[in-house]
Each structure stands twice: as C-alpha cells, then as structure tokens.
Amino acid sequence: MNILVTLDRNYLPPLRVMLGSLLRNDPGETFEIYAIGDGLLPEDWAALEELCAGRGRIHPLEVPADLFADAPVARYWTRAMYYRLLAAELLPRSLDRVLYLDPDILVINPVRALYDTDLEGDLMAAATHTGLLAGITDPVNRLRLENYEAEAYYNSGVLVMDLSAMRREVRPGDIFDYARGHADILLLP
C-alpha cells in the first residue's frame, strides 16, 4: 500500500508517532512510504527506515526548488504544505494511487478499506469533520471562511489520491494563483 507523508524537520517527532500507530494498527499490511521532506538529515531518514523495518520501506523524495519558486508562503502555509497538493508531480510516475496522511495524526484502525475507496472518477477522497470535532471546528471556520458550509469543508490531513487523474487535471500554477488570491481566508492548510 502506498502512503505519502510530507514534512520538515519540525514534524519528525509526530511523524514517528503516526508511523508507529499505522504499523501497530494495521499488522497485516506492508507499506511503501513516500516521504517528501525539507531539511531532513541522513540520520533522520535512517531512523525512519529503522522504525518501519520489516513492515515498510521509506522512499525519501527530493523536491525540485524551481517547482515552488512561485508558491506563496506564510507562517502556516509553508512549502511543505503544498507537497500533498502536488503529489502527482513529485511521486514516481509508476504510482497511480496513494493515501496521504498528515504526520500529526494517529491511526487507530486498519487503512486498507480507506485506501481501496472507489473514487468514482474524482481526484481525491477526504473526510469532513463530524461529531465533537465539528463543534470545535465549525465556529472557527464560520469566522474565517466566507459562506462556510460544513458539508463543503473537508479535512486535508487524510486524502486518498488518484495520481493518474491528478496528473491530467492539477497544475501547480493554478494552486499557487488560488492561494495568492485567497490568502485572507486560507489560514490553515
């Protein structure tokens, strides 16, 4: 199963927790973990490889600097935040599907059913906030997002991606232009 994580060095501790929870809660799976990272040292990659030994392989990916030359960045909108949106550009062409997991989540169930979700021609599948979490996030989103509707909002921390479709449809410049044009409402990635 193909897993994508994106990070900089600040997210190494939570990534270790997330990967540990993924491996513990899905004991029957083997994972190909593609990691797009900024500023990681060789010993960082070695520690991640050791953590996943026997159950998964870490594939460190380099980021072409020129791809992000026009990317607007801010405190919460770092270069690393864009990596998931441009996954199809950064991952090997041999991959057609990947499950993106934020480094700061906990995996509490097997992820195979999620990974195998029928996307019905859509580029991605994502979850909305529900239950107790919606009671926390909805008021914040009403303040920061014009015309906020809970049903139209999704959590970008867990995404099933159709990479083949994304390669046909997603253009980096369009993403950067949108981020630049909507910086006032795009507070959190």
Question: What does each model-identified segment do?
Answer:
Residues 105-139:
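Conserved donor-nucleotide/metal-binding helix-loop-beta segment in metal-dependent transferases, i.e.
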Residues 129-132, 151-189:
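Catalytic core and acceptor-binding pocket of nucleotide-sugar-dependent glycosyltransferases
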Residues 31-39, 126-127:
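Short internal beta-strands
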Residues 21-30:
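Short, acidic, metal-binding catalytic loop of nucleotide-sugar glycosyltransferases
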Residues 98:
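Short aromatic/hydrophobic "clamp" motif used to bind/position activated sugar donors
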Residues 43-90:
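Active-site-proximal specificity loops/subdomain of glycosyltransferases
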Residues 101:
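Catalytic metal- and UDP-sugar-binding loop of GT-A-like glycosyltransferases, i.e.
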Residues 3-9:
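A conserved hydrophobic helix/loop-capping motif in glycosyltransferases and polysaccharide synthases
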